[in-house]
């Protein structure tokens, strides 16, 4: 299997990441990747940048050092109803790729049925393309049901080695 893109990365505008956009693109190039999505946390996450970061993504070149740069975000799942970070439409228009993920700081782990319901609701969110790090053991859910529904709704499930 050849990996051609990394669709879940954070630059140093997210507190737990340490590389600049330029460094991330260079690393992607050095690894032979064709594309990289820059998906910093949403603005309501304590680890995320200000919303202006996402408004300014239109300034990021589409191609750097031969690597396609995908302008993205990692939305936080914030409610059992499938709520995610709220952003102004002017910021969302610069987003090409969006993940939705559970993070303990904004969604305390609950039970399997609550996690499943939240994920199912997000299947209908037109701004979300994929689910991030579903392998987090703190957020058990009905895998078979959600994965089959992702296929029906055209959503992607990330394989994240940090969760393995």
Summary of predicted features, one role per range:
Residues 29, 42, 47-159:
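Extended substrate/RNA-proximal surfaces in nucleic-acid metabolism proteins
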Residues 4-14, 38-42, 131-135:
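Histidine-centered catalytic micro-motifs
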Residues 1:
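Catalytic phosphate/metal-binding cores of nucleic-acid and nucleotide-processing enzymes, i.e., regions
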Residues 163-164:
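Short, intrinsically disordered, charge-balanced linker/junction segments flanking boundaries
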Residues 13-49:
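Metal-associated gating/positioning segment near the N- to mid-region
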């Amino acid at each position: 299997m050849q990996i051609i893109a990394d669709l879940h990365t954070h630059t140093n505008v997210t507190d737990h990441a340490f590389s600049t956009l330029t460094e991330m693109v260079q690393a992607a190039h050095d690894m032979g990747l064709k594309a990289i999505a820059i998906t910093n946390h949403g603005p309501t996450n304590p680890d995320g940048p200000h919303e202006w970061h996402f408004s300014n993504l239109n300034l990021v070149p589409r191609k750097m050092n031969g690597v396609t740069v995908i302008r993205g975000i990692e939305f936080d799942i914030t409610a059992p109803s499938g709520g995610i970070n709220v952003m102004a439409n002017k910021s969302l228009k610069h987003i090409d790729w969006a993940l939705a993920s559970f993070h303990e700081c904004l969604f305390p782990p609950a039970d399997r049925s609550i996690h499943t319901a939240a994920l199912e609701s997000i299947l209908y969110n037109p701004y979300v393309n994929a689910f991030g790090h579903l392998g987090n053991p703190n957020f058990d859910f009905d895998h078979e049901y959600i994965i089959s529904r992702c296929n029906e709704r055209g959503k992607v499930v990330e394989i994240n080695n940090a969760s393995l």
